[in-house]
Amino acid sequence: MHMNIIVVKNYEEASQKAFEIIKSLVIEKPDANLGLATGSTPIRLYELMCEDHRVNKTSYKDVNTFNLDEYYGLKHDHPQSYYHFMHEHLFKHIDIKKENVHIPIGEGHIEEDCKRYNQLLSNNKRDIQLLGLGSNGHIGFNEPGTSFDTSTHYIALKESTIKDNAALFFNGDLDAVPKSAITMGIHNIMESKHILLIACGKRKAEAVKGMIEGEVTEELPASILQRHPHVTVIIDEEAASLLTK
């Protein structure tokens, strides 16, 4: 197994560590392909990237970004769309070019859009793919039971994911949460050169244990990362609390 597991004290330290890895890539390779994630986990990392850009002038002008997923049925300008999230938390605060930002389209012709995104991904292998981890072990919106062979696809979200997202972003309103999404498939994720996964908090401990110590199974999508040649897992003490090794 090629997992480099880094256990830190808390979320702040996890974000700092992830930031150091991303910054050193961007300095070493100014036209890097970055795979980005949304949700609550990367928010502090993006703040650190914005602060660093402002203070140290680290440039993203030649960087290309590829987001994991987008809710289906939300327009770009919807305040809960991942397009909006990325602009608010990162893109509008750094010098990235608009044409270098790639996010799945959450409306319109599903098949065509998935095909186009797959083409884009196979032409642009990510130097680093950032991932969070769902409490049910999902990566991107690849829910338990998703085939490891999938590329970008439309998916109906599991109830546990809808509940998690309602609590985090929709003031607990289950009805307001989109019930489906377009997501990079597990095959696309596994094509990345380096995978950087961050997981913090007790809620993630069970999924972390399964991902690192469990068997590789489609019932826990993140377990496939055991088969990737270069994975860095950054977890805080709470998320690491069930690990036995």
Please give the residue ranges for each predicted region.
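N-terminal glycine-/serine-/threonine-rich phosphate-binding loop
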Residues: M1-L34
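A glycine-rich beta-strand to alpha-helix segment
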Residues: A32, S40-T41, L45, L120-S147
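ATP/nucleoside-binding phosphotransfer catalytic cores, i.e., glycine-rich phosphate-binding loops
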Residues: M184-H187, E191-K245
